[in-house]
């Protein structure tokens, strides 16, 4: 399930898409964890007051990368690099766009959680032994655990054990190559 939102940037309506694929696409493109980066940006921007924020150049680049991935996910015709995409704008304010992207991401995560609750086969409490058992059942190595989030591992386990997922499309190599 995904959510699309249009945000006005520099007088243009830009579509942004949040879905379960975003963390993977972001990690593949930038070798970073989008959850950590969004939390970091949210802390840095504070209450949206430009004068009292803790934004540095690295934070700005993280924001631009997140915005780019979500825009590219919504519109495949967007250029293949964040730099080319950003060239389309005269101004691109983190203080106007980031809060809306965080809200969009929050709506998507909330929708995913509600959908997963409906698909969950068990109401067992997630404990460390249960989590490790699931990792073993999925055949994950310690190196895999370093790269994957707990949520992604739980998603992988749910999908491997549940036939109720009805996907309209199956991703192919071309889909991954676009990102």
Predicted regions and their residues:
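Charged interaction scaffolds used for protein-protein
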Residues: 1-13, 20, 32-57, 61, ...
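Covalent nucleotidyltransferase core used to form phosphodiester bonds in nucleic acids
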Residues: 24-30
